[in-house]
Curated annotation (Swiss-Prot):
It comes from Saccharophagus degradans (strain 2-40 / ATCC 43961 / DSM 17024). Its EC number is 3.6.1.-. The record marks Y17, Q75, E159 as: Important for substrate specificity. Keywords: Cytoplasm, Hydrolase, Nucleotide metabolism. The keyword Cytoplasm applies. It catalyses: N(7)-methyl-GTP + H2O = N(7)-methyl-GMP + diphosphate + H(+). It comes from the Bacteria. This is 7-methyl-GTP pyrophosphatase.
């Protein structure tokens, strides 16, 4: 294991979900909000958007903390050629879940880690295919009322009741669907002072 350092590990996110995930690794870290424009660019697909936003968040925090390790991440969801964002309202969540029911949605969980040692970025994007059950309007409204997934891409929380919406999940990293791909993160942190084991 590399020796400890005076550098900090900073998660470029205020997401309680991602913070809880990072805590699983038992690493000391702080958070910093990376307020950026998260609009989708013309011609950009869901994966490109997630990768770009994760990198932009990382670089924004790295400008202020050039001697620290920075973890940036972003997640988007794609249904055919439609990018599903955070719904923000119950009606938008309802419409998203109606679109998703009985279909497969691909989630892109992008990770970008900045290393102060060599000023390099390590980037990764994990795909997760989620097949939704057939759902009726009543089931969808009940779910939204019970879990209020208004701040989640795709309008569900897979770590909670949202799992009941699914028929199956396919991914190389089961943690990615929550928002922070921990397997890729552990790989990125190898040979750093923040190697988990």
């Amino acid at each position: 294991m590399p020796s400890r350092t005076s550098a900090n590990l900073i998660l470029a996110s205020q997401s309680a979900y991602r913070q809880a995930q990072l805590r699983q690794l038992g690493l000391p870290f702080t958070t910093a909000a990376a307020y950026i424009n998260e609009e989708v660019l013309t011609g950009e697909n869901a994966q490109q958007t997630a990768v770009r936003l994760a990198k932009t968040k990382t670089l924004k925090i790295a400008k202020e903390h050039a001697n620290d390790y920075i973890i940036g991440c972003d997640q988007t969801a794609g249904l055919d050629d439609i990018i599903l964002g955070k719904p923000g309202t119950e009606e938008n969540a309802f419409n998203q879940l109606m679109q998703c029911q009985a279909r497969t949605v691909t989630f892109y969980s992008a990770l970008c880690v900045y290393s102060p040692e060599n000023k390099q970025l390590i980037q990764h994007c994990t795909q997760t295919k989620v097949s939704f059950r057939e759902l009726n309007e009543s089931q969808i409204r009940s779910y939204i009322q019970r879990e209020s997934p208004l701040d989640c891409a795709g309008s569900f929380k897979c770590e909670g009741l949202g799992i009941s919406l699914f028929e199956s999940i396919q991914s190389d990293d089961p943690s990615a669907l929550i928002g922070l791909p921990l397997i890729a993160l552990c790989t990125a942190l190898q040979h750093t002072p923040f190697q988990p084991i």
